[in-house]
UniProtKB/Swiss-Prot annotation:
Any coiled-coil regions, as ranges: 1-244
Keyword Secreted: no
Keyword Coiled coil: yes
UniProt main location, coarse: cytoplasm
Extent of the signal sequence: none
Name this polypeptide is given: Myosin-7
Region named Disordered: 216-244
Length: 244
């Protein structure tokens, strides 16, 4: 009976210890599961941030490409304006030379007029006025061309500055994407390790649960044997009293 009682107590102690181990493993497993859920949420948020950063990077790249195209177009327009300005400048010089020539001829004509060539002089004066008007018109057009050229130069400077800013933003966004991707990889690795640890603890939990079931079964058997022995002992005591 004492041996059976000790077995029962040992079984009960083993049952208590096993229950405590089960509770500890259950707490650890719950903590790991919560940690994995948090890491999954962080990973999802990081993936969203990466997608937004990549989209922003693409938008900045498109904007930079457009700015470069606009700058190229403005440079082409500036070149055309410069060519036009150079052409007008050449025309201006030619007109000035023509006026000088005509003025010289006019001076000569005045001499002729003094000798009776008044009609020829009037024609030359009319021609001089006509050329002066043309020169004035050309000068106005030249001034407009210079104004347009300066405006184009300012626009090119603005586009160049904007292109440089877009390029810097593009580099910054690319660096951000690289850092976020590294962070995502680290979270994925931690999540995989946590899941592996959770699976290991689950296996341990199942093993301990099996041991607990066996310990409970042994405890029940021991308790049943103790009860039988007690009943048998009472029967033996009763029979002894009756025989006396």
């Amino acid at each position: 009976v004492e041996q059976t009682e000790r077995s029962r107590k040992l079984a009960e102690q083993e049952l208590i210890e096993t229950s405590e181990r089960v509770q500890l493993l259950h707490s650890q497993n719950t903590s790991l599961i919560n940690q994995k859920k948090k890491m999954d949420a962080d990973l999802s948020q990081l993936q969203t941030e990466v997608e937004e950063a990549v989209q922003e990077c693409r938008n900045a790249e498109e904007k930079a490409k457009k700015a470069i195209t606009d700058a190229a177009m403005m440079a082409e327009e500036l070149k055309k304006e410069q060519d036009t300005s150079a052409h007008l400048e050449r025309m201006k010089k030619n007109m000035e030379q023509t006026i000088k020539d005509l003025q010289h001829r006019l001076d000569e004509a005045e001499q002729i007029a003094l000798k009776g060539g008044k009609k020829q002089l009037q024609k030359l004066e009319a021609r001089v006025r006509e050329l002066e008007n043309e020169l004035e018109a050309e000068q106005k057009r030249n001034a407009e061309s210079v104004k347009g050229m300066r405006k184009s130069e300012r626009r090119i400077k603005e586009l160049t500055y904007q292109t440089e800013e877009d390029r810097k933003n593009l580099l910054r966004l690319q660096d951000l994407v690289d850092k976020l991707q590294l962070k995502v990889k680290a979270y994925k690795r931690q999540a995989e390790e946590a899941e592996e640890q959770a699976n290991t603890n689950l296996s341990k939990f199942r093993k301990v649960q099996h041991e607990l079931d066996e310990a409970e079964e042994r405890a029940d058997i021991a308790e049943s044997q103790v009860n039988k022995l007690r009943a048998k002992s009472r029967d033996i005591g009763t029979k002894g009293l009756n025989e006396e």
